Amino acid sequence: MSVDAATVRRIAHLARIAVDDAEVPHLQDELNAILAFVEQLQEVNVDGVEPMTSVTPMAMKMRTDVVNDGEIADRIVANAPVTHDHFFLVPKVVE
């Protein structure tokens, strides 16, 4: 698969990236190199290989799910200019 200049411009448009005409050939080469690498990965035989979520074996430690307020609510609201019952008070912006 090969990326042409029109595809580079379309990808840039979809990503909302401004691309000058002078940059298109360089980006085209970059995208073609990425696609060539992905095509190379497609050729790897993975039959019998278990799916992995990490390259290092590890088990997540389970803990009880306890709801708390983080014990810093007072410090957080201390930064606000106006508060009431641990809530930030802000001016009304919509009528």
From Swiss-Prot:
The keyword Nucleotide-binding applies. It catalyses: L-glutamyl-tRNA(Gln) + L-glutamine + ATP + H2O = L-glutaminyl-tRNA(Gln) + L-glutamate + ADP + phosphate + H(+); L-aspartyl-tRNA(Asn) + L-glutamine + ATP + H2O = L-asparaginyl-tRNA(Asn) + L-glutamate + ADP + phosphate + 2 H(+). GO terms for molecular function: asparaginyl-tRNA synthase (glutamine-hydrolyzing) activity; ATP binding; glutaminyl-tRNA synthase (glutamine-hydrolyzing) activity. Its EC number is 6.3.5.-. Keywords: ATP-binding, Ligase, Nucleotide-binding, Protein biosynthesis. Heterotrimer of A, B and C subunits. Belongs to the GatC family. Allows the formation of correctly charged Asn-tRNA(Asn) or Gln-tRNA(Gln) through the transamidation of misacylated Asp-tRNA(Asn) or Glu-tRNA(Gln) in organisms which lack either or both of asparaginyl-tRNA or glutaminyl-tRNA synthetases. The reaction takes place in the presence of glutamine and ATP through an activated phospho-Asp-tRNA(Asn) or phospho-Glu-tRNA(Gln). This is Aspartyl/glutamyl-tRNA(Asn/Gln) amidotransferase subunit C. It comes from Nitrobacter winogradskyi (strain ATCC 25391 / DSM 10237 / CIP 104748 / NCIMB 11846 / Nb-255). The gene is gatC.
